[in-house]
Amino acid sequence: MRIPIITRRQFLEASGVAAAWTMAPTTLRSAFALPQVNHKFDDIRSNLLHLINEEREVEKARPLELDDFATSVATAHAEEMAKNEFVSHWGRNGMKPYQRYSFAGGYHATQENISAADNTWSMKPEALKQDTSYLHVRLYQETPPNDGHRRAILAPHHTHVGVGIAVEQLRLRVVELFISKYVEFKPVPRIARPKDVIPLNGSLLKSNYLLNTIEVFYEPLPKTPELEWLREPRSYALPDESQVLRPIIPPPYEYADKRPGVIQVKSTGEFEAPVTLFKDSPGIYTVVCWLRRNRGEKAFPATELCIRVEDVNP
């Protein structure tokens, strides 16, 4: 009997490649310990960064920088997926990408791409480099309307990316965590009570951008999902329930709905806003600053700052 010879690419396709697109401390310190980044994968990370920036250059989007903190967060999720044999934007604790990043100590806006291959032939560095490149290119080559990964790679407002890589036995997991760094916050409480008013103080890092609105999203506390649930592909998004805060505008100008603005914005780019945790029940609030460069441009999310409310007396 003749044994068919197949390429590594054919083997990856046959073994099942999975990919899917689109989380306390009292200050901005990490809510959990992040793993040490395995530097044996540095060459693979550099190669993926090179691929990403080549693809962005074609679309005239700015090149991204590799972010160490985002890489640590991405690595933690990649390792968890590899060890527990699942592929999901949700973690074992039920947290989504922006929640993981925020409760680790971050607050910038994120987008996550994940990819995976099982039963890979070789764990040698050059073989893994080929596999991770192939997995990434599959995401980049998506076509509308199912092109969420590609849009994450090419989004013009991203500034940085973290790359997490994990190998467990013959399981390979890759996490690309895209970051948008435009805002700096002063320390913010990460644990609060229902109906608390959190003073939010920040500044824009780029003078050619405007603060359009601040949107405060609410969702219930995450529940621990079953592993079988994590093994089913699904996309993630911010929750539907939210309240919008707008900048104060001088009289005689007013908003069409007559509601007053509450965000004080200075000419220096500094801003202040009272963020009300508007529900009586426990949950997670995510504070999103929407920015734009001019009045006619579509606003984009620049922050995803999460605050956890557990009960009346945390």
Regions found by a protein language model. Name each.
Residues N208-R246:
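Extended low-complexity, serine/threonine- and proline-enriched intrinsically disordered segments
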